[in-house]
Amino acid sequence: MPEAPTAKTAPAYGYAPGAHAEALEFIEHVTANAGQVQRRVLGEILAQNAPAEYLRRYGIPGSPDVVDAFRRLVPLVTYEGLQPDILRIANGDTSPIFSGKPISEFLTSSGTSGGERKLMPTIADEMNRRSLLYSLLMPVMSQSVSGLDKGKAMYLLFVKAESRTPGGLAARPVLTSYYRSRQFLDRPRDPYTSYTSPDEAILCVDSYQSMYAQLLCGLVHRADVLRVGAVFASGFLRAIHFLEKHWARLCHDIRTGELDPEITDRVVRDAVGRVLRADPALADAIEDECARASWEGIIRRLWPRTKYIDVIVTGTMSQYIPTLEFYGGGLPLTCTMYASSECYFGLNLNPMCKPSDVAYTLIPTMCYYEFLPVNCNNATAEASHRDLVDLVDVKLGHEYELVVTTYSGLYRYRVGDVLRVAGFKNKAPMFSFVRRQNVALSVDSDKTDETELHAAVSGAVQHLAPFGASLVEYTSYADAATIPGHYVLFWELRAGSTAVPASVFEECCLSVEEALNSVYRQGRACDRSIGPLEIRVVAEGTFDKLMDYAISRGASINQYKAPRCVRPGPVVELLDARVQGKYFSPKCPKWSPGNKQWNKSKDLVGKGDA
């Protein structure tokens, strides 16, 4: 069968033009033969991981037909079911628990368990699969957009804080792992992977210095930029907001050819110094655009050759589409790839489609896919694995939860993404992203569910007790109108005998933040990708008005209960019209790298072995 170029020759975002046909042929082959490829992938995974303790528990190795045994015997599993074994590895156990190959590092998920990032064990070979998927992006995009090899890409990419487990393995986000890999740093010279950002700026852990250096280099290369982007829409908008605040300083650097002294990282200064030259005319041109009263269309005005904005705008990121369209001035928004910490999955074969039409084709070589119909009775993992549907057997228009078995050693793992079948590429389905299971609030990579939010609010309202006040009802929404976005809580209170000071409401804001998960707190305290949490106190009777509105729209009065999360629109307008006070968290919540659950690993392992 034809193969896409190996990771040793595949650059991060595409090939030289001569290899595009080979990449497209690879996509055509694996999608046309999706069923056969999937059977081969499952066989390879089970053969590679035959020594794994996890598979031995279910009697898979040694069975006459391991694939049949896997289908019959291995149950569905969530992260919580794997956590005792994961913590064994984190604590230094090097035995083959999940994989026949050594665990090379942990990838920290944006999803959380017990308030901490989930730790996804991975093997070194997985980096080659990720690189292969990246290598397919430009061949696909070049079918829709020509001339992308005639200039540069301004991608704003960042690393995040990482830590070491007690056993010495790195624990870091999947993109941080990729940007630090030899596959990214040693990528061959290629006209499709010419970036404005120096690697040194991307790898700078100081987010301010990294952002400043990357934007400065992007402005210096203004005339050459053909595409702009970031991973998430929220991250790209943070960059625009940063530019709004600092464009005068950036123009000064370009005018003088001298980098701002606040950029103190020597490696970054040296890298930018190789790009920056005094150019008063360029500084004047940028200044003229940035000094205008309106920033509508600023992307197209600052980078006039840009053909599209490459960011994720599916799922919760769709809330940023209007703002992106304002700044983009009509530039297409492209979604190119579907991936997670567990595994990289697929790509959008029609990347220039409207955001509402984005559908991802799952590449059958990446892992073994199964799908759990969202309407089936899946209350227990033991029963629900019998309801799983193979990749080639899903039905158009139906919704499924994604379940994966990976080379790294996840077996029938519930990713938590709900997907809808939107069409087919040959025998391989194309999926639109519907939602993340059990997520109430999200403005960046954070994911907060209703249970976590309720516990945080319940703790925070204790600050009101000395004043005789109590919480009648509350709801929340993710406000994407601010940059960065932030959580808003609407509280209706029963007043006490003493007025509650503003400082107490601010303490309530901080208390909620302190009780939220580590991904949220990192976004607030370290990455500054989330703004201060806000409490809006509404007038008495507001939630009665909200119920009246819901009933007028067809809700049952017998079954109605106040929603814990609402979306921008008429409901938020109703709530905002009755706001009596607004209060913000006065400082960032505490956060530090690492995982508090590592200290509990022995207890958890004991429970898991029982």
UniProtKB/Swiss-Prot annotation:
May catalyze the synthesis of indole-3-acetic acid (IAA)-amino acid conjugates, providing a mechanism for the plant to cope with the presence of excess auxin. Belongs to the IAA-amido conjugating enzyme family. Pfam families: GH3 (PF03321), GH3_C (PF23572), GH3_M (PF23571). GO terms for cellular component: cytoplasm. It is an enzyme of class 6 (ligase). Expressed in flowers. GO terms for biological process: response to auxin; response to light stimulus. It comes from the Eukaryota. It comes from Oryza sativa subsp. japonica. GO terms for molecular function: acid-amino acid ligase activity. This is Probable indole-3-acetic acid-amido synthetase GH3.1. Its EC number is 6.3.2.-. InterPro entries: GH3 (IPR004993), GH3_C (IPR055378), GH3_M (IPR055377). Keywords: Ligase. Induction: By auxin. PANTHER family: GH3 DOMAIN-CONTAINING PROTEIN (PTHR31901:SF9).
